[in-house]
Amino acid sequence: MQSLAICAYYCAVSFIKSEQIGAVLRLTLDRPEKKNAITQEMYQSLANKINEAASDFGIRAVVISSSGDSFTAGNDINDFANDPQMDEGSPVFSFLFAIHNFPKPLIAAVKGRAVGIGTTMLMHCDLVTANPDTKFSMPFVSLGLVAE
């Protein structure tokens, strides 16, 4: 069982690429085969990296970007169906708290589709750049659900 937990951690971390260039930390959603759909583990990895950057004096800004042709398809529905963590200690809330409380410039470089959380997370960014062909959508609104 421990090896499964270790694999889950390292597999998730591999879906979030981290690169520091000078004083800028770039976090890249790197799951293009799934349109960068975000899993619980990816949320936790993002939260951890953003929280670390908040207290690192060598990092002056964070850029969130993506690989492939989509920024993100939103939440990975299969992952959330199998493990629906939604309390304040959940990875999703950890991520939202991290970006909401981040004391330095938070920048998003968006291309392709930004679905669900891919759109709502942008409201917490200080600057958002988007390609001209970027499509923003919040499908949960058509169900009468608004998370904000």
Q: Where do the model's predicted regions map?
A:
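Conserved CoA-thioester-binding segment of acyl-CoA-metabolizing enzymes
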Residues: 4-67, 97
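Glycine- (often His-adjacent) and acidic-residue-rich active-site loop
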Residues: 58, 65-101, 114, 144
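CoA-thioester-processing core
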Residues: 95-101, 109, 115-148
